[in-house]
């Protein structure tokens, strides 16, 4: 059975098997997760989630053992993972994997931190769970996509539930049989529809919180003897046939289980990407390209007559020309490009400022906002067949701007094949620290040094140190 082999790997994996490169990457990912989540906790969605949890569980006492990042109190493991997961994803700045087409760190660290602090696990145990989560998560995501995503499922919610179950099972030291039961329970709870994304709701960030919650719940249930189906992934009415394949009559053997199992434990965690801009990852190549053009035209954006964006199909589908709220704005390719061309800065603070100045309203007195709207009105988004052929190994975008007669109707264009933050076009550690500082200017950055030596500490100490 497929999941039985996965469970064996999870149960047997040890810290000593990790490469230096993997350890370096996951420590950088932990730093990034903490910075994004610390800032994200001030957003509306995690605040609502936290208030809801307190409404259901209105007690704070010494028996509550897991921290909510950025808060000065503790709660239970499930609630902490749930709220931290939402906060980790709400800014659209959390890490992911290009081929697996999902966000990993938001689920993995929300799960691992809650359990590791509550049980005061060692840094080595914490890292074991984190690396196993990345390894299995990347493999499962690559196995089911792009078909799974193309059917309308948000892989971060669906496969993310399995990932959380993997991490929780490892940290709770479940044996192979218990881990298999936990993954079986994860599969029957795996959920997440991309309509939440397109609808401009908070549902998309709920997927991360619920993935962490359900994965942890599954592992605890399995530890206590609750059983789950060992064929939930590849069975006749399992995950693949109901949520991935176009036709349930397809032969399940088209999936290369042998290759997946052969590669388990060999996936390079280094292949994850880190995000620079608070927009959907599919928009980042277009943002990078627009910023290159901004460097060429400077402040002459009022002379832009029209803009054409040629990109791959999934990116082109993010063609919302009239976003009504922040959630919709983060998925709007026209606005992402226009903001880049006008202000040359794509940060959380800048986006919030533009919204305050009327970016999402029908009228504004601010010149930059009106310039952005004018560019959006003169923009076309095109799905390009040749660029689409390069996806998903590349995420290309070609942005073309035509200037007015003051510039002799000149045409500027540029193309990006892989956005900033991918392994082949990486964000360096100093850039991740700059990202952290930009999000959290009042945080004492010296607290982060504990992450460099996680192996030397227990996780309760690590959390206290990060709290400052």
Give the ranges of each region predicted by the language model:
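Terminal-appendage/accessory-domain detector
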Residues: 1-101, 203-213, 220-468
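Hydrophobic face of alpha-helices
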Residues: 23, 27, 31, 108, ...
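Well-ordered alpha-helical scaffold segments within catalytic/enzyme domains
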Residues: 39-40, 112-119, 165-171, 218-222, ...
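Hydrophobic alpha-helical hairpins/lids featuring a short glycine-rich hinge
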Residues: 84-142
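Short connector loops/turns at beta-strand edges and beta->alpha or beta->beta junctions
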Residues: 88, 107-109, 114, 136, ...
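Short helix-coil transition sites and intra-membrane helix breaks within transmembrane domains
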Residues: 98-105, 153-158, 276
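Well-ordered alpha-helical segments within folded domains of soluble proteins
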Residues: 106-113, 160-166, 213-217, 283-285, ...
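Glycine-rich, mobile lid/loop segments that gate access to catalytic sites or pores
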Residues: 117-216, 231-236
């Amino acid at each position: 059975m497929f999941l039985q082999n996965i469970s064996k790997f999870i149960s047997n994996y040890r810290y000593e098997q990790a490469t230096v490169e993997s350890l370096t990457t996951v420590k950088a990912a932990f730093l990034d997760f903490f910075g994004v989540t610390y800032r994200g906790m001030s957003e509306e969605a995690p605040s609502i989630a936290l208030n809801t949890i307190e409404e259901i569980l209105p007690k704070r006492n010494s028996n509550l053992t897991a921290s909510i990042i950025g808060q000065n109190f503790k709660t239970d493991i499930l609630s902490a993972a749930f709220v931290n997961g939402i906060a980790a994803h709400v800014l659209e700045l959390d890490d992911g994997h290009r081929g697996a087409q999902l966000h990993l760190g938001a689920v993995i660290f929300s799960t691992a931190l809650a359990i590791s602090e509550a049980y005061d696990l060692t840094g080595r145990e914490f890292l074991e769970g984190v690396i196993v989560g990345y390894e299995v998560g990347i493999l499962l995501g690559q196995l089911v996509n792009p078909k799974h995503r193309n059917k309308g499922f948000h892989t971060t919610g669906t496969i993310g539930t399995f990932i959380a179950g993997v991490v929780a099972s490892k940290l709770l030291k479940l044996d192979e049989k218990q881990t298999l039961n936990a993954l079986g329970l994860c599969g029957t709870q795996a959920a997440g529809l991309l309509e939440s994304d397109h609808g401009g709701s908070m549902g998309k960030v709920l997927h991360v919180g619920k993935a962490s919650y359900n994965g942890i719940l599954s592992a605890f249930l399995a530890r206590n003897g609750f059983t789950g189906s060992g064929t939930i992934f590849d069975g006749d009415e399992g995950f693949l046939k109901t949520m991935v394949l176009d036709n349930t009559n397809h032969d399940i053997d088209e999936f290369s289980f042998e290759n997946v199992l052969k590669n388990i434990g060999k996936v390079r965690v280094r292949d994850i990407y880190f995000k620079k801009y608070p927009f959907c990852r599919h928009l980042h190549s277009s943002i990078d390209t627009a910023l290159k053009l901004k460097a060429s035209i400077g402040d002459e954006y009022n002379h832009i007559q029209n803009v054409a964006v040629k990109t791959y199909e999934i990116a082109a589908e993010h063609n919302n020309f009239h976003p009504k709220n922040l959630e919709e704005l983060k998925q709007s390719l026209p606005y992402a490009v226009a903001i880049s061309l006008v202000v040359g800065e794509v940060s959380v603070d800048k986006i919030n400022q533009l919204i305050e100045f009327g970016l999402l309203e029908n009228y504004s007195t601010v010149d930059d906002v009106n310039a952005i709207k004018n560019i959006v009105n003169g923009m076309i988004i095109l799905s390009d067949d040749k660029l689409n052929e390069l996806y998903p190994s590349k995420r290309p975008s070609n942005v073309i701007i035509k200037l007015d007669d003051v510039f002799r109707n000149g045409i500027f264009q540029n193309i990006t094949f892989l956005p900033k933050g991918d392994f082949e076009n990486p964000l360096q550690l100093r850039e991740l620290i700059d990202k952290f500082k930009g999000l959290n200017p009042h945080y004492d950055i010296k607290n982060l040094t504990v992450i460099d030596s996680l192996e030397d500490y227990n996780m309760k100490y690590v959390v206290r140190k990060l709290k400052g």
